Amino acid sequence: MKQITGGVCAAKGFSANGVHCGIRKNKTKRDLALIYSRIPASAAAVYTQNLVKGAPLTVTKNHIADGVAQAMICNSGNANTCNANGIEIAEQMSELLAKELKISAKDVIVASTGVIGQPLDITPIADGIPALVKGLGDHSNLACEGIMTTDVKPKEIAVEFEVDGTVCRIGGIAKGSGMIHPNMATMLVFVTTDCAISAEMLAKALKEDVKTSFNMVSVDGDTSTNDMVSIMANGLAGNTVIGTENEAFDTFCEALHTVTSYLCRMIAADGEGATKLLECIVTGAKDEGNARIVAKSVICSSLFKAAMFGADANWGRVLCAIGYSGADVDIHAVDVSFRSVKGEITVCHNGAGVPFSEEKAKEILLESEIQILIGLNSGDGNATAWGCDLTYDYVKINGDYRT
């Protein structure tokens, strides 16, 4: 397996584009994105667990109930959530795009992201769709820009892998900077692949993957109303269709996880106002479920995130987060270390503090990528979670979000 360029356009038969249609006031910001497969594709998606859901999620869930999609359209700048005519607008988006592409509206995935509770005018979207379609090409980067809101950096990746000797490709783009605390999904992620796989197995692969990828990311503890992870697989690589849990399925799942885990790191690193990527690696839990609970609890602790912003090796906040996590843990067996490119330092052993150099700890924690290593020493369960530090700028960004 190797990383390649191309994002969602790396896989055969996929093209993309992003334009400014006028939803956002800033004319330099793209606010409408499209991903298109030249043939119908197997499709699957997972959705936010927030009880308040954006209208596009309802429409998308209905559209891909048959496991088929051919295009994805997404606007940024308006969430189309809590609007009386939200479903109607989302359906209109799919119908307008389908007419321009000459495909079925039922084969369109619809997404929106932005401010909640503001009416979404269909006019700029309708006006922008012809240019969006006309400009289709190898423009994964433009589609990526079109789904961004408070994101500072675009997020895309693609990898190449082999299934039974056939070269396949899978790529993805993501949006996510704030309201990141998934239970799936709380971010927008769009994945494409030319691997031939049934809709049933595609859904199974995605559902399992998010447990250890996007559901293990947190920026601010807020679960969004709108976001989802979707995937289209058009089969143009020409491999034998993956229809069961076999070696080929395992290979596909590994490639998918390479893409999703990379996007997870990018989302966490680009958290609103963030200066540091935090990666919490838990080993030795009684099982994987307990490991995930501990890792997510630590990465979600506002006190711990603030300590990381200040490069303060306050390991007590780690133990505190472990203690209230609800995981089955022997706190007297817990070890904690911090690691970065500047080295590694142990700050806690068997649930108690150990002598360490505060100066060395600060040097380690001043880096932009920090690993929190937690050994529970109670079993074979492992997990990793991603997050970021909590800074002054997070409050500034969200205090001014609607302005």
Predicted regions and their residues:
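A structural signal for small-residue-enriched, beta-sheet-centric alpha/beta enzyme cores
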Residues: 1-88, 92, 98-403
